[in-house]
Amino acid sequence: MDGMEHVGIVGTGLAGVRAAAELRAAGFTGKLTAWDAEDREPYDRPPLTKSLFGERVRPLASQGLGDLAGLGVRVVPEAAASVKLSPSRALRVSGVAVDAAILATGAAPHRKMPGAHVVYTSDDAARLAAAIPHSASVRIAGAGWIGTEIASAVASAGLPGPRVELWESSGHILGRSFHGAVDDLWLGWLEESGVDVRLDQPLPEGQDADAILVQATGSAPALAFLAVEADRTARGALATDSLTRVLSGGSPVPGLYAVGDCADALLGETTLEGGHWTKALNDGKATAAAILGVPPPAYIPPVEVFSTQFGHEIGLVGTVPADVAPAREEPPRGGSVMRWEREGRLLALLSVDAPRELSRARKALRVRRG
């Protein structure tokens, strides 16, 4: 794009780093400045819970996902105070003029329980991992992906002391993702691992002094700094188009983009929600194309979740409908699969130790960019 000399990136997690890498790969030679309060080398977040007692801090650069120094990104080690549009429609990040701003601030965990641990940063994970061995019990509020991963990590660590309790105020394990369809599967794993599961029960107030409390009850897009009028989705994320351009009144805000967990892409009648690693990984390609005026990727990848729990490699691709019962299969190469279809069309697939089936579903569910 003509006149594009300085791009600001707010956040240096996976989505922000990939946006910088894709801009350079597409030929951008101008100035890149990034803001992030976490003053350390960018790292991958999923291992913080999956590998709570193992190699939980894995730098993105070591995985080939992007090295900010090597990409020539100047990093300001503080949170962006604001992103604003001037009366002349010029963008400023913390008072610094930029030609385009990419918002990649992710989603911050809910913090509503006094004294509870959350796992969002490497420091959060380190504090929790250090506290657990000295406790009599670990009480986890929330049976979503984070809560079940932490339960798995603690139960599988072979620690002699703490018992693990998993409390969920709804009646389902991973209810937001599966609407009750996987309760029997996960309950079997949890109970076999010795986890005490309490469904339909919020964690009661008042805790034993020797109990560790973990809040894993969801998150919200981290956008308090944004001083630009923009459309929001039901979960509070920024609404974008397929090129990650932030929308206001249904039209793109010039120069403003949002990637990863803080953004949901509106694709006709479908919404591709943030909150998933693969969206953070892939959004930068579309952003770079939009900023530089080059063709974007032909396909938009579907929503995808990966998890390692109770000795199993788990993958979910697509969005599970609440009104369709899954078909269960056992592929010839092993593992198991749950498939959601409507009128012969695949909507979502859950694989347990069946990566080949997941790969096929991923290809079937991608959307051609309109």
Question: Each PLM stretch: what is its role?
Answer:
Residues G115-A136, Q207-A280:
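FAD-site-proximal beta/loop scaffold in flavoenzymes
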Residues S137, I146-Q201, P301-F306:
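Rossmann-like dinucleotide-binding cores of NAD(P)H-dependent redox enzymes
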Residues P355-R369:
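A short, polar/charged loop-to-alpha-helix boundary motif
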Residues G11-L14, A141-I146:
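Glycine-rich Rossmann-fold phosphate-binding loop(s) that bind the pyrophosphate
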Residues T33, R74-V76, H117, W167, ...:
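General small-molecule cofactor/ligand-binding pocket signal
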Residues D2-V73, A153-S177:
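Beta1-alpha1 glycine-rich phosphate/pyrophosphate-binding loop at the start
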Residues D2-G8, Q63-R139, Q201-P204, V214-A216, ...:
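FAD-binding core/adjacent interface of flavoenzyme oxidoreductases
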Residues G3-E5, A222, C262-R356:
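Mid-to-C-terminal Rossmann-like scaffold of FAD/NAD(P)H-dependent oxidoreductases
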